[in-house]
Amino acid sequence: MEFTKMHGCGNDYIYFDCTRQPMDRDLASQLAVRLSDRHFGIGGDGIILIEKGQNADFEMVMYNADGSRGAMCGNGIRCVAKYVYDHKLTDKTTVTIASMGAVKAIDIQVQDGVAVGASVDMGAPILDPAAIPVVTDCKPPVDVPITVHDTVYKMTCVSMGNPHAVVFIDRSPREFPLEQVGPLFEHHPCFPDRTNTEFAFVQDRQNIEMRVWERGSGETLACGTGACATAVAAILGGYVDHQVTVHLLGGDLQISWSGKAEDSVRMTGPATTVFSGKIDL
């Protein structure tokens, strides 16, 4: 079966074009675990199936590296947009892509006939604790105290189609013990569906530095929905302006949001093809 390895700011997935070669979704979960292994597989943060859409131009079906189903991936959706354009599945530079029922509109950035990135309408942030979901009496869930391993943190919880807990720290997140603390947030009992966790340092009113621990995948070099959630949390806290650059380990994403709960968050960033190949399933 043919595959393409792609990444957005280092957040890499293995993509299967199921418009041309259908795949059983029961197989996909097992395949995600096998192929995501960076020593014995292709290596990636998971796999993404590209299918024809029913309520959108295309549908993306995402599986994390542990085989669990992912609801949305901001970096992945940009790569899907690049794939369908570069492989002539569409000639449109604005496409709609669905993931677990949520439809996003993507403006594809093209240079010399090749898609190099995309700007995505990520929809309005979800700040209702029950819908995120997170167990808290704080509405909206801003600066919520949480005790993790005898340390009290303050987090702001946001859903961008998947749950995020954003923690602002007073130093570069490169110095933060993410490998120890991230899993404790992911599996904390206040998150019924687990959570993605971002540890962020506000450099100035236009720049945020961030590391992320993704549920089901661990640390990744970038997380598009996490960058959106972090920008939303920072704007709610009054730390930054309405347009910011989020600096991740794998690259930069531009995020904008008006600060109004009903308005969409817009994410802009690159999409890159690494290589293509064939694998026996």
Spans of features found by a protein language model:
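Glycine-rich beta-alpha junction loops
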Residues: 124-126, 160-164, 271
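A glycine-rich beta-to-alpha transition motif near the start of alpha/beta enzyme domains, typified by
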Residues: 1-114, 165-281
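N-terminal, positively charged, Ser/Thr/Ala/Gly-biased leader segments
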Residues: 1-22, 120, 136-158
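Extended Gly/Ser/Thr-rich low-complexity repeat segments
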Residues: 129-138, 276-281
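Flexible, glycine/proline-enriched loop segments at strand-loop-helix junctions
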Residues: 70, 117, 130-133, 144
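Membrane helix-loop-helix hairpins that form the core translocation module of multi-pass transporters
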Residues: 117-119, 123-125
